[in-house]
Amino acid sequence: MADTGEKDTETTASGTDGHSKEALAVISMLHECGIQEFDPRVVSMLMDVQYAVTSKILQMSSGLSRHAEKAQIEAEDVQTAADMLGVLTTNAPDREKILQLANDKNQQPLPQIRHNYGLKLPNDRFCQLQQNFVYKADDSYQPMEMQQVTHQPHIIEPPTQVLRPEHVQNMLKRRAPDDDFDS
């Protein structure tokens, strides 16, 4: 625990806002990729991935050096381990190969839809897929002149009748079953 406290004081003293060297390297990689805004948790996630990949490569290279009966891990062992894991290679598939796979997949017909499956659309003549209007250009079209509209202020006058309790009681009473609801 004392080591982390010393590390924090060293990094803050150097003006790195409490980030370690590894975190600063990840942040600089993000900035080089054009990512200016990111969640601070992204840095720790990328550091976790970096640690996992590095430890996997080193474990593999350690196994390779032990198999070759070497006392130390050499750069060749690390390079071989990285090649075996495929970490450092970024070989994207060829465009032609992807197009060929897509064409092969698209040549296969889709399975037939069962007759009783889902909702069916009505016949085309009953579907409103076509426009239902015809635009007629009017040659005598003239734009209207803008007129200024003046609004008279509408004054709400106080009601002349006051709501009485008997009016409220009449409104709350149930209607007879033979009453017409439209009236």
UniProtKB/Swiss-Prot annotation:
InterPro entries: Histone-fold, TFIID-31, TFIID_subunit_9. It is found in: Nucleus. SUPFAM superfamilies: Histone-fold. It holds the Pfam family TFIID-31kDa. GO terms for molecular function: protein heterodimerization activity; transcription coactivator activity. GO terms for cellular component: nucleus; SAGA complex; transcription factor TFIID complex. This is Transcription initiation factor TFIID subunit 9.
